[in-house]
């Protein structure tokens, strides 16, 4: 008999290095403890992730680590660690405002409203951050889920061929390519094995929007506070030009530098 695939009541987050955690992390941590009392909370770090193995194995991970691009180191780590585990990954700036158990048990109105499209048990959930992109501030997965395997394979080869590097764009690309996600941006894929929640569930306000209490809806379970540090010049020079070669790479880097300093002067 095959092992039953379930999403465990475990919360995972990534933290690299010995730097002091920001205040937003502790606010979110308290929300996890308060609203998810039955969930185990696990930190993914250098002690429980085989850094040496992956630094040797994956060039992109190694270069990000050497350049201290911790956001992208974290992206890679979350995918690989969660592939071997079952539970819910959350960013350190993802506040949880309601118990997620009804989602895991598929006992919310969303599933009832989509019942004509569902014939299988949910094995992976994630959410849209806007009308176009899937975001990765929170996702739930069963162990050895094929979606995360596809993402891992992207990091092995396609990462050097495609002009994308942020994990929302990587997930969106893989969903479009492998799971036939159309421009309609479906919520149910593979007869219910994959669920992509509308933005109101976890991203009630967008990256370029200002938070107001009015954005919280009855179906909102989390608030992503968008506490990122993605845009250093060092990061841009590496990430935006990684897929190019020769003169194209040189020209791209010149444009990146010019754009960066023009922005700084404004």
Please report, for each region that a protein language model flagged, where it lies by residue.
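Small-residue hinge/turn detector
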Residues: 75-87
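Glycosyltransferase-associated regions of secretory-pathway enzymes
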Residues: 1-74, 90-266
């Amino acid at each position: 008999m095959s092992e039953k695939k379930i999403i465990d009541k475990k919360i995972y987050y990534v933290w690299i290095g010995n730097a002091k955690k920001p205040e937003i992390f502790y606010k979110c941590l308290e929300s996890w403890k308060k609203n998810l009392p039955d969930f185990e909370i696990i930190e993914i770090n250098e002690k429980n992730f085989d850094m040496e193995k992956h630094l040797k194995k994956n060039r992109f991970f190694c270069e990000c680590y050497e350049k201290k691009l911790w956001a992208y180191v974290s992206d890679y780590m979350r995918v690989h660690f969660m592939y071997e585990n079952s539970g819910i990954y959350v960013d350190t700036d993802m506040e949880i405002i309601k118990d997620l158990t009804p989602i895991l048990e598929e006992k919310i109105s969303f599933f009832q409203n989509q019942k004509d499209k569902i014939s299988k048990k949910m094995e992976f959930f994630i959410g849209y951050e806007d009308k176009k992109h899937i975001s990765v501030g929170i996702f739930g997965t069963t162990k050895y889920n094929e979606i995360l395997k596809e993402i891992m394979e992207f990091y092995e080869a396609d990462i050097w061929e495609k002009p994308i590097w942020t994990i929302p764009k990587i997930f969106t690309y893989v969903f479009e390519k492998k799971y036939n996600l159309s421009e309609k941006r479906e919520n149910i894929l593979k007869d219910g094995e994959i669920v992509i929640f509308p933005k109101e569930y976890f991203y009630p306000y967008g990256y370029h929007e200002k938070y107001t209490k009015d954005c919280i809806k009855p179906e909102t379970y989390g608030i992503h506070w968008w506490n990122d540090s993605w845009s250093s010049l060092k990061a841009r020079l590496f990430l935006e030009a990684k897929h190019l070669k020769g003169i194209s790479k040189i020209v791209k880097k010149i444009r990146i530098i010019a754009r960066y300093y023009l922005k700084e002067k404004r």
